[in-house]
Amino acid sequence: MSMLLTSRWTGAAHLEAARTRTTEIDVDHLYLGLLAVGGQAARILGRHGVSLTSARRRVREALIDDLATLGLQATGDVVPPPKAARELDFADWRATSRAHDLVNRAPLRKGTAAALATLIAEPSGVVRHLLVTDGVDPDQLMTELASAPTEPDPVERVAYDPSLLPAPAWAKRLRHYLSSPPDLVADAIADAALLAAWAYDPNKAQVDDSGETIRHTRGSRTMTVRAHHTRRREGEAEVVTWIQEVASGAHAGQPLHYDRFVVAAAPGGTELLHTAGQRSFGLLGRLTAPLAGWFSWVGMQYAAQRIGLEVADRQAA
């Protein structure tokens, strides 16, 4: 899992650098990348009042201060306003030598909290300074990070919802923290255009213009499903549920899979509770359920992080 987390983290750092048209990823982008991906480090920072938005603001302020020290003004040409990465032409992944060293040394097998501790201990003091300007005591934070749970957050087997799927079926649940406002998280999850980011592999599927009719290809076999969603409030949380139904064949019109997201406000961001349910068709489906369950475990981790990156890119700050 550490390789997957490293890929998500460095990809998020690349996005953060691209937003401000920076040619090389540096320590501050790695810090923002941890917040964009979400997880334990972002959750702990949120409890200290740090969000992705506030951290981006502190990084920008630090850059302006550095320019002022050199006698330069932070004009639009020197410090361009941030843009969504999807609006930019991406440069190749390039990083400073110290950023490369940090990525190689960060003990991601222990999770994002351990990676954050590595950034705080980095000799330049970049992240320590950003934390101080955000009102956080770095030494106190280091103590808290040392006792943080490892990652990824556990995926647990739960009872499936019989109102969404007929038997036989199974379900699993994942809790994940995102350093973004809950309304933006719910908007992103409810957007059919973003299904390709987390719900299916766009390299192995074709979709219609609505983004809700998906034709999956596995070797010589294909299956077409139609996705639709509901969105409602339950207490203080928003609940977005996507249901995929078989579009053709003997089981046409029957539900195959659901993803239920409970989106709740948390300090500095959002606590996301994702339950994925899968129907097992016939003897073959029941025989392959354990393997499908394993893939869903990996897929749910990936989906949570991908949603985090998409929401982070939508934030203007």
Where in the sequence are the language-model features?
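Histone-fold recognition with a strong bias for associated Lys/Arg-rich disordered tails
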Residues: 1-179, 184, 197
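Well-ordered beta-strand positions in beta-sheet-rich domains
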Residues: 173-175, 224-226, 258-260
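A short, structured loop/turn motif at beta-sheet edges
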Residues: 182, 232-236, 263-270
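Hydrophobic pocket/interface hotspot
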Residues: 185-189, 195, 214, 274, ...
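Glycine-rich portal/gate segments that line the openings of hydrophobic small-molecule binding cavities
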Residues: 196-197, 205-254, 310-315
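Histidine-centered catalytic/metal-binding microenvironments
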Residues: 200
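Beta-strand/loop substructures that line and gate deep hydrophobic ligand-binding cavities in soluble
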Residues: 245-298
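A conserved amphipathic terminal alpha-helix motif
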Residues: 288-317
